């Protein structure tokens, strides 16, 4: 089984589907505050599956999952050049977090996200 490629990850103030295209609104100075939208684009997607994004506290041994979203996608036997996913993530306190992007529980991508106080 081949896995898709994560080609884009953004945390946005707003995102909408306008005629099949993502219309994005970024945070001023890229200072993400809660609530926010997670936007993920996968390339080279085969078959169906479940994409999830999970947010974790810090980077130490005591790290724990604090939020997450899941998206079912695709059909068995089909190929998609790309698929875009987006949804709002609510109520994450200001701080530094790490996140992981998984397809069928396999980690494909991870990163760090700073959530700022609402100004």
Which residue ranges define each predicted feature?
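Short, surface-exposed loop/turn segments at beta-strand-coil junctions that are enriched for proline
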Residues: 87-91
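A glycine-anchored, Pro-Gly-centered beta-turn/N-cap motif
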Residues: 76-80, 93-100
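Short acidic/polar inter-strand loop motif in beta-rich domains
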Residues: 103-112
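Contiguous beta-strand segments within globular domains
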Residues: 10-46, 81-83
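Short beta-strand/loop motifs in extracellular/secreted proteins, especially
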Residues: 47-51
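Short beta-strand edge segments in extracellular beta-sheet folds
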Residues: 70-73, 114-119
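Solvent-exposed serine/threonine-rich low-complexity stretches and specific carbohydrate-binding patches
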Residues: 64-76
């Amino acid at each position: 089984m081949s896995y898709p490629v994560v080609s884009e990850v953004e945390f946005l103030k707003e995102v909408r589907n306008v005629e099949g295209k993502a219309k994005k609104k970024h945070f001023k100075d890229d200072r993400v505050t809660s609530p926010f939208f997670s936007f993920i684009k996968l390339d080279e997607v085969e078959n169906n599956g479940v994409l999830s994004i999970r947010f974790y506290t810090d980077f130490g041994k005591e790290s724990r999952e604090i939020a997450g979203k899941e998206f079912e996608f695709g059909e068995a036997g089909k190929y998609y050049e790309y698929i875009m996913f987006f949804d709002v993530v609510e109520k994450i306190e200001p701080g530094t977090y790490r996140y992981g992007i998984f397809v069928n529980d396999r980690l494909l991508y991870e990163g760090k996200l700073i959530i700022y106080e609402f100004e």
